[in-house]
């Protein structure tokens, strides 16, 4: 009986070609993104969820065990996907380190500067995948925007507009800041982010990147990068039609990260 169970377990962690499947711990398993990821993984043959973590485990109806704390997880895993809350960053990093450096795919937004520094420091000894947006499309747009900024130089003003549903708490969005940081990294000199022109009664500075937030309805997520020059405007835009696309990116990242060594990885590795 024990041998039979063991063989069944071995079969469920290998795909039809005999390759080892990626075993995932899903933090935030009872949230909207958790449900998307659970459904997506159930349809794939290269990975499986072996355990979930969520404070609201009563809502968990999936076929895997769920816990209220990651410290309670005993199932062996190859990678952690986190779609929970910024406050859980430290416990997740500690757990990953204690388990021999399990890769962590961090998809949660709203980290403070101190938390970003914490995960960056952890990546020196642990494999960490961190992106403020798991969409392949938005990350391709980011690379295109960087290319445009290099070519256009300071002859074009840059403005970023982000739109989200009326339940989103943080503003500007993590993705808008990700875009701004990427653009600032390829510009000459220092860049200032301008969030509120109402408070600044002066002409626009060339060194500025304007960032504007819109909240309303059920908008999943829209981002525009505007390059405004003399007599011409170039706009790069991305519109998310469903949060499911973020689940696809997260699971692809998890499979990619399985077995990776220490370092800080992001979506540029998948673009």
Name each model-derived stretch:
Residues 62-72, 81-90:
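Glycine-rich, highly charged phosphate/nucleotide-binding loops
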